[in-house]
């Protein structure tokens, strides 16, 4: 199945897929660095963990802005140059985080990183899916999405190798040089998507308007979240998120034109993002704070879970090529349900590692199908924008997860013997698995659809 998908690849196809995978891996690394050092940053700035969890919320909440802005640029100027720009920007903003003197500056740096991070998935997925042959899309989808747990795995190793010697600030410095080298590799070795066509005319003024709009919305969100989010929690976070959803729906032409598909895809991606972020983002904190494990044990468990994630993503994405996108995701989402209690309630390092391994097989097994499924459903002329934007709007809704889980963990509530972070992890995982299975059951499938040549993004 996977071996057949690897046959007969051209050099251009190999480089395109490698670029998309590595771009998403490095992006995920820069994101997950924070999840390992939240207790250290909370101590540095003399705040509690929910206040630092706001940085995760902020990073996720602003990603739709990057998906829209960079997606439009990629539809008009090509996937390759905008992918390079994206990688350089998120590497620079990730590096800048290390020098934040105050919590507010730290949050602003993570917000800017989130905008750059928002563009990378949609552009990389479009480049790879438009380049490879249809029969290889399932495997490539799983490979591309495995970049996310690969980045998490590298962050796990970096935590074990760097944290003790250089602290949390040193962790944020690691990604800069790899980012520059990756951008250079794409510039020298990667070809433009064979599907993308340069528009006859590109209205530069349109992109200025988009950029100004993104800057205004980003500034407003940063102001609300930083001013009120730390003290008032979810109420003000939702107050910042809801207007952005309204603006996105009203002002984005391709969402207005394809609103039924967009609403469906956003709800679907809301479930997917709760599934991943709800089982991953606070997991290192769960290991450090609730179980009091040392750096080596945390590294071991997170490496094991990410191996499971990579295996699950590659296997089930490849399976979807013959079994179907919808049926594969429904199967894996339902498989997660009996695993959740064991995963959240285990007490020893060995049992926690086993539970995390099984859980992430399910989580990334479902996620592995997402790149190909969204790109097959997307309208061709705005594929670079549509897939990335609906993905990140789902991320926007799910961005409340980190603060919600941190506050629930510290509330003292108990259910079925679960408490603290165990309860917070289990509640979100169960909700997300059921939502994903329901949405996939209700939704369409476009397996192996002919993507054709993308027309200019004139909307």
Feature-to-residue mapping (PLM):
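C-terminal transmembrane helical hairpin of 12-TM major facilitator-type secondary transporters
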Residues: 320, 326-370
């Amino acid at each position: 199945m996977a071996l057949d998908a690897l046959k007969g690849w051209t050099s251009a196809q190999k480089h395109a897929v490698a670029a998309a995978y590595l771009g998403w891996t490095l992006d995920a690394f820069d994101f997950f660095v924070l999840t390992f050092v939240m207790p250290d940053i909370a101590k540095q700035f003399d705040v509690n963990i929910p206040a630092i969890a706001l940085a995760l919320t902020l990073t996720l909440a602003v990603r739709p802005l990057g998906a829209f802005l960079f997606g439009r640029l990629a539809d008009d100027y090509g996937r390759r140059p905008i992918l390079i720009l994206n990688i350089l920007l998120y590497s620079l903003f990730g590096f800048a985080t290390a020098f934040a003197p105050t919590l507010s500056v730290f949050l602003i740096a993570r917000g800017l990183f989130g905008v750059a991070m928002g563009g990378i998935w949609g552009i990389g997925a479009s480049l790879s899916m438009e380049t490879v042959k249809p029969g290889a899309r399932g495997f490539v989808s799983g490979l591309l999405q495995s970049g996310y747990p690969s980045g998490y795995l590298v962050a796990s190793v970096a935590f074990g190798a760097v944290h003790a010697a250089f602290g949390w600030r040193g962790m944020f410095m690691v990604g800069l040089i790899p980012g520059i080298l990756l951008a250079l590799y794409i510039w020298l070795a990667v070809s433009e998507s064979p599907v993308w066509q340069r528009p006859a005319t590109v209205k530069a003024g349109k992109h200025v308007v988009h950029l100004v709009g993104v800057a205004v919305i980003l500034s407003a969100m940063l102001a609300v979240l930083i001013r009120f989010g730390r003290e008032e929690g979810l109420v003000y976070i939702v107050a910042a998120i809801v207007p952005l959803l309204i603006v996105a729906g009203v002002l984005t032409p391709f969402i207005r034109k394809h609103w039924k598909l967009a609403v469906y895809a956003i709800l679907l991606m809301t479930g997917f993002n709760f599934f991943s972020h709800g089982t991953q983002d606070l997991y290192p904190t769960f290991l450090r704070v609730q179980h009091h494990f040392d750096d080596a044990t945390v590294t071991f468990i997170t490496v094991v879970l990410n191996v499971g994630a990579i295996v699950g993503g590659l296997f089930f994405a490849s399976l979807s090529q013959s079994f179907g996108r919808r049926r594969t995701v429904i199967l894996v989402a339902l498989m997660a349900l009996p695993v959740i209690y064991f995963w959240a309630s285990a007490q020893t390092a060995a049992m926690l590692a086993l539970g995390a391994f099984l859980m992430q097989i399910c989580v990334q097994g479902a996620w592995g199908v997402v790149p190909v499924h969204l790109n097959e459903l997307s309208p061709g002329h705005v594929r670079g924008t549509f897939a990335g934007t609906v993905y990140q709007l789902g991320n926007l809704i799910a961005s409340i997860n980190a603060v919600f889980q941190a506050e629930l963990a510290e509330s003292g509530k108990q259910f079925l013997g679960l408490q603290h972070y165990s309860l917070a992890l289990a509640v979100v995982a169960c909700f997300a698995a059921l939502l994903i299975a329901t949405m996939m059951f209700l939704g369409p499938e476009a397996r192996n659809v002919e993507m054709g040549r993308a027309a200019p993004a004139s909307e």
